[in-house]
UniProtKB/Swiss-Prot annotation:
PROSITE patterns: MATH. InterPro entries: MATH-CC_domain_protein, MATH/TRAF_dom, TRAF-like. PANTHER family: TRAF-LIKE SUPERFAMILY PROTEIN. The lineage of its organism: Eukaryota, Viridiplantae, Streptophyta, Embryophyta, Tracheophyta. This is MATH domain and coiled-coil domain-containing protein At3g44790.
Length: 324
């Protein structure tokens, strides 16, 4: 198929509010992708990710070779590049490099990587093998699957069946959770000015749904779920909820999920390396058997020559009659 390229320019890099940042989505090889970067300790980590990971059909796999490049805008020769080959599937939805470039080198004045507070990243993707189909065209905006949205209603339950907790009408099943939240974060809604009870209930449902998401196991949370959680958090902050504590928890979960995905990707890479190594060992063993057979044949030939030589040595000496 050959390489196809996507260029990502990260603007205002030095003033990013989050450790995590995503590129726009792009389509290569009939699949929608995006790039994810995050500042991990002393490095910028960079990964290629499947954008529609939660809606992939069963059996979907792509064997992909790709190159990630942090472009040096002063000299192409100084650009930082990493190349990877790996399978993407329903379990492994990202692959890349945790130590793409050191933050010291990236932020260096006149280093060429950060110019006008912009970082330029290029990914070149070559889909080598395709298993399963995913109908995504260059012009399509999304896979034809409904987007998951955090519910903003109360599932049709009437206000008469709700209970007031700190000025919020909540369901009986939500009372204990809401009380506990306000006990630990009493100032959470002090600046929340909405008077409409439907709006207030909607905001509380968003908050509870977000907390439910964060309480799931890492195996059950998808990358898409975390993307929806980020949107929910922005909605709450825009509504003047004080949810810094929740933002920190979301960052922790995102980091753990990223580590889990990186671990899966690394395991797959090691499995591929082990497979290649075992094949090499098998080839060496086969060659060794051939050499052993050659050695055995030579030993047999040597024994024959020894027998001939011994027989010749034991022959009686010639007599005068034999000579004359």
């Amino acid at each position: 198929m050959g390489y196809e390229k996507f260029t990502w320019v990260i603007k205002n890099f030095s003033s990013l509010q989050s450790k995590y940042i995503n590129s726009d989505k792009f389509v290569i090889g009939g699949c929608k992708w995006f790039l994810k970067g995050y500042q991990n300790a002393n490095y910028l980590s960079l990964f290629l990710m499947v954008a529609t990971s939660k809606t992939l059909p069963c059996g979907w796999r792509r064997y992909t070779r790709f190159r990630l490049t942090v472009v040096n805008q002063l000299s192409d020769e100084l650009s930082q590049q990493r190349e990877t080959e790996t399978w993407f599937d329903q379990n492994v939805v990202l692959s890349g490099n945790r130590h793409m470039i050191s933050l010291t080198k990236l932020n260096a004045k006149k280093g060429g990587f950060l110019v006008n507070n912009e970082v330029k990243i290029v990914v070149e993707v070559d889909v080598l093998q395709v298993i399963g189909k995913l109908d995504v065209s260059e012009g399509s905006q999304e896979v034809t699957q409904p987007l998951k949205r955090i519910r903003l209603n109360d599932d049709g339950v009437s206000v008469k069946q709700s209970i007031d907790v700190n000025g919020f009408q909540v369901l009986p099943s939500q009372v204990e959770s809401v009380k506990r939240i306000f006990e630990r974060h009493p100032n959470m809604a002090l600046e929340f000015r909405a008077k409409n009870q439907h709006v207030r209930t909607s905001c509380m449902n968003v908050l509870l749904s977000l907390i439910d998401t964060l309480c799931q196991s890492l195996q059950d949370i998808s990358i898409d779920d975390l993307g929806q959680a980020e949107k929910a958090l922005r909605y709450l902050k825009d509504s003047d909820f004080k949810v810094d504590w929740l933002e920190r928890k979301l960052e922790e979960v995102k980091e753990k999920k990223m580590e889990e995905q990186i671990g899966k990707s690394r395991m797959q890479e090691l499995e591929e390396e082990l497979k290649i190594f075992k094949q090499k060992c098998s080839d060496i063993e086969a060659q060794l058997e051939k050499e052993k057979q050659k050695c055995s044949d030579i030993e047999a030939l040597l024994e024959k020559e020894k027998a001939k030589s011994l027989a010749a040595a034991r022959a009686p000496p010639l007599t005068l009659d034999d000579v004359v």
